[in-house]
Amino acid sequence: HTYRPIAREEIQCAIKGWKPSAPGSDGLTVQAITRTRLPRNFVQLHLLRGHVPTPWTAMRTTLIPKDGDLENPSNWRPITIASALQRLLHRILAKRLEAAVELHPAQKGYARIDGTLVNSLLLDTYISSRREQRKTYNVVSLDVRKAFDTVSHSSICRALQRLGIDEGTSNYITGSLSDSTTTIRVGPGSQTRKICIRRGVKQGDPLSPFLFNAVLDELLCSLQSTPGIGGTIGEEKIPVLAFADDLLLLEDNDVLLPTTLATVANFFRLRGMSLNAKKSVSISVAASGGVCIPRTKPFLRVDNVLLPVTDRMQTFRYLGHFFGLSGAAKPTVYNLSRWLKCVEAAPLKPEQKLSLIREHVVPKLLYGLQNPSVTARTLRDADKLIRTTVKRCLHLHLHTPNQCFYARVRDGGLGLTDLRRSIPRIMLDRINARRSSDPMAVALFSCPSFDHLRGRLVALAGDVPPSHFWREAIANHTTTKGLEAASDDPASRSWIFRKPYGWSGKDFVRAIHLRTGNLPTKAIPSNPAGERLCRGGCGKQATISHVLQRCPVVQPERIRRHNEIARKIAAHCRSKGWTVEEEPHIRHPLGHLYKPDIVIHREGLPSVVCDVQVSWDGYEPLDEAWRNKQRTYDHDLFRTAAGRRWPGKTFLHLPAILGARGIWPRCNSETASALAFTNQLKASWLHSCLKWDSTLHTSFMRAVWSRQAGA
């Protein structure tokens, strides 16, 4: 029973997740409605009275230009906006109707099931299984001309009665349709007179999908109940696949297909709609002597117009995938190549190009690659194209490890999607989340050809999820070991998503080079072992860690890096009202001298001895550096000296360790808690460290080149 008072929970459920949109002709916005307590009683009154207020019937339409000649009216897309209050009521009614009425399972559009996957797999399985069995098969893809705009209101009333919708709800729905008007904006400040809407469902109205599906439900039930027609999938006869107004007719018998097509055309004609024969297409393959022979001459008609036939060289598009005589066509990387060239040529900064590829180009590619015919080679080609483009945009070496690209940002990578490992796993997850009560899905998943597809996907996906695989790769590679600690704190990775204030594009690229091991040094695998020594004359391997942390050539810059971070921490502590001493000299009676970076005296709390250190975040964990630094002062000799310097004080020994590659380790959590370090402060100190690392490397390169030039 859908005609009942509205509960407060229904209002809350309808408002939850309601995205802001333009106001209707009454000027009310979604934000205004979600903030007021009026809607429940107000919309309930009009629902129970079966009355549609005049402001709800008045809508406004804006024309959005499409591609092509704008003098042609068909190249404009009308967007009609109704009252937000009415949309709220219709969201509630739509949920009630969906819960009360069970439509035919062949309709996957607007249903709570992964309909695009199921229908695509059903079509591919039908074609491939019939070809394997060398049997006749026919597929007709039908285009309904402006289906949502032309469905008659009388057919909607008929559908509501057929489905047993109660009289109160039916009267309200028919009233909201028959009394509707709209005005079309035709220029700045100008609009047409009111235009009465005599057919079609409202675009953007929450009820429209259910009403259209309700009309189509009669056709789907009629076809399913007709004996003998349909295509065989597993043990089931399936005559039609529907996704909203996208219809596919499946038929094993050539003789019955024209009759089925005529029945469908007549159904739409009686309900104010029509089939577009020129945009429809058919596949027809006859089996003769154990050989499948495609028909190349059109033989099906709609309104005396022949439907085009797909031959061996052609495909047709269905739900974003291309299908031909052999089933789903293998996806290509042509569009990806074109998109990446556009991104690379765009006048954007490096971090903007990276963000565009990661957040827009790759996600746009994901759906098209979730194709039954996808292969490992196609996915590898797509991955290689993306990696190559990112390397050029960020000026990375060809030998940059793949884990630097595919590990999650929280694991120390750039967060790109590894298509080779992700796409098969995504498809398997979608398949495993299917609704087992759907008889069409059950028929699909029991088909032998589907078992072959599933086995192939399992082999492609592997045993380890991509995120785990690449995190392990980061943790076990010489160049990237230690970056997995970026997951310890958001401050270690925030700059990858959003360039810090004051950074140039060059600063961002240099920071990426540091993370990925791309700062130029002599100690790289391609150099002979004898040519990897430091050009500063210290006789050590010229690794990035050596240059930044140990080489005496840039010792002054290292000291300035340390002092800047220590000063910033001291300034923060002073802003809290604490007394701060920087590098105090604390001498023990036996002559030992201690010079901690900062001592913070907090009123009513133990004083904090904080020594700052920038350590290389590599094979030696930063936790070990933290413990070593703590042991420097956490012993009896220092406590005796500190007690003489500050009588009556107690002390906490809490170092602050920063990773040279911008890592804030978990071991700093006690220090951060005691000294009230915010995420913003931690991030700013790490950003300073990263910029200083770039300066250190530049100074080193200048120094060694000057030395070589002088020699």
Swiss-Prot record:
**Ranges for domain Reverse transcriptase:** 45-323
Name the keywords, alphabetized: Endonuclease, Hydrolase, Nuclease, Nucleotidyltransferase, RNA-directed DNA polymerase, Transferase, Transposable element
Instruction: Report if keyword Nuclease is assigned.
Output: yes
Database matches in InterPro entries: DNA/RNA_pol_sf, RT_dom
Task: For the region Nucleic acid-binding endonuclease, give the residue spans.
Answer: 444-711
Q: What domain of life does the UniProt record list for this protein's source?
A: Eukaryota
Might you give the EC number(s) for this enzyme? 2.7.7.49
Citing just one GO molecular function, the answer is:
RNA-directed DNA polymerase activity
Please state what the protein is called: Retrovirus-related Pol polyprotein from type-1 retrotransposable element R2
To which species is this protein native?
Popillia japonica (Japanese beetle)
